[in-house]
């Protein structure tokens, strides 16, 4: 449910949503016009570290153009990218997404609430939480405030079943409010392994936190059937 809620390609509904917002006028290119008469151009900023994100944006560009939105990708460097977001100069950005690909009731839901400045959809709110109110901005969105409350409730709750209930409420809010737009999930990660290296699983979950990529499969139990000929060890 959470993964597929807004994942369907429905240009008719997307156009209707934009019409309902009052963005009915278009220029000669078919790009919708904002209330001030300017075309609806979106500059999506990236950290410029990989062509994967710009390739994805090229695919999105063609779909969004059909509903009257023109997007441009703007690569930069990570420190510049983050500082622009932290200072509120960025309209929209693209990033790698949620770290926790193995969420359970006992996993922290911190990534789904404004708990840190590093969460790029709400840096000022996250900074406010991180600094105990000394910097940033106090959330003025009731749903974001509820997410923070649920996060605190989860931290104080020792019972697994109640933690699970809290997680479901967090995901319900996060899904309905769409604080970030999910693009891809469950991408296959090919891994090349020597036939000489044994005890490596054929299939697995490739996730950094939790999981540490290969760490979850105890790489200390991997072993070479024969010693590589170019090994310095004898």
Model features per residue range: what roles?
Residues 24-29, 69-75, 93, 180-183:
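Acidic/polar loop patches that form or flank catalytic/metal-binding clefts of enzymes
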Residues 73-83:
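Short helix-initiation/N-cap motifs at beta->coil->alpha
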Residues 60-70:
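Short alpha-helix C-terminal cap/hinge motif
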Residues 46-48, 75-77, 185-187:
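A mature extracytoplasmic/lumenal domain signature
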Residues 6, 71-73, 152-156:
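Short, well-ordered beta-strand elements within core beta-sheets of diverse protein domains
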């Amino acid at each position: 449910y959470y993964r597929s809620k807004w994942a369907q390609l429905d240009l008719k509904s997307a156009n209707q949503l934009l019409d309902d917002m009052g963005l009915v006028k278009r220029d000669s290119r078919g790009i919708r016009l904002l209330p001030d008469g300017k075309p609806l151009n979106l500059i999506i900023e990236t950290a410029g570290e990989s062509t994967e994100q710009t390739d994805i944006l090229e695919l999105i560009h063609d779909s969004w153009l059909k509903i009257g939105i023109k997007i441009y990708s703007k690569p930069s460097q990570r420190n510049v990218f983050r500082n622009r977001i932290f200072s509120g100069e960025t309209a929209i950005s693209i990033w790698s997404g949620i770290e926790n690909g193995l969420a359970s009731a006992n996993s922290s839901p911190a990534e789904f609430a404004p708990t840190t400045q590093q969460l790029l959809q709400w840096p000022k709110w996250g900074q406010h939480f991180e600094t105990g109110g000394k910097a940033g901005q106090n959330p003025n969105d009731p749903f974001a405030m509820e997410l923070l409350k649920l996060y605190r409730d989860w931290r104080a709750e020792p019972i697994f079943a109640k933690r699970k209930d809290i997680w479901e409420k967090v995901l319900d809010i996060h899904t309905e409010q769409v604080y970030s737009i999910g693009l891809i999930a469950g991408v296959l990660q090919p891994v090349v392994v020597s036939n000489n290296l044994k005890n490596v699983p054929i299939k697995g979950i490739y996730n950094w936190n939790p999981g540490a990529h290969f760490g979850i499969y105890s790489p200390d139990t991997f072993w070479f059937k024969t010693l590589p000929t170019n090994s310095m060890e004898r």
